[in-house]
Amino acid sequence: MKKLLLILLISLGLIGCTSNQIFVGSSPEPMPVVDYVDLDRFMGDWYVIATIPTFLERDAYNPIETYKRDNDGSIATTFTFNKGSLSGPTKIYRPRGFVKDKRTNAIWGMQFVWPIRADYRIVYLDDTYQQTIIGRTSRDYVWIMARTPTISQKDYSSLVARVDSLGYDLDDLQKATHE
C-alpha cells in the first residue's frame, strides 16, 4: 500500500511540474543544453553538490546519482542518500533515463513512474566530465553535480553563476552535505 501511495504521489508531483505549461499556456524560454555528451564518459557516480530539490530529495544527505547504460539503450539510474542526517536511513530510488535527443545525448526523459518521463537536460558539462549541471525547461529543479563529494569554492561559485544565468531562483538552491 505504501508503495502504491508513493507511486501516486510521484505521478501527481510530476504532473504538477508540467501543469503550468499545460494550463497557463505560457512557454518558458528554451533551456540550452551542451553540444554533445559522450554517454560512456558520463556514466558512473555523480555527487550532488547543490540542488533545488524535488520533494523526494528534501532533507537528503550524502546524495549520489549513479548512471549505467543498459543493453536496451536506456540508462539505469540509482539515486542514493541518507534521509534526515548523515547517518540517517538510506533511501534508494531507481528511475530509468531515456536519451531523447540522439544528436546531443543531452536531453533525457527520466522515468520514476511509467509512463511519465520527466524533463532532464545536461545544461553544463566541463571538458573533463568532472562537473555538470542538470536542469529542466520549467526551471523548477536543478542539480549541480561533481565526481567528488566536494569542489572548490571558486568552482562552486562559477557553477552557481551558471545556474543563475539560466533563470533559476537561487533562493531555492540548497547546498548538499556529504561525509
Q: What residue ranges belong to the model's regions?
A:
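Positively charged n-region of N-terminal signal peptides that target proteins for export
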Residues: 1-4
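Bacterial N-terminal signal peptides
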Residues: 7-14
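A beta-rich soluble binding module of mature secreted/lumenal proteins
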Residues: 17-179
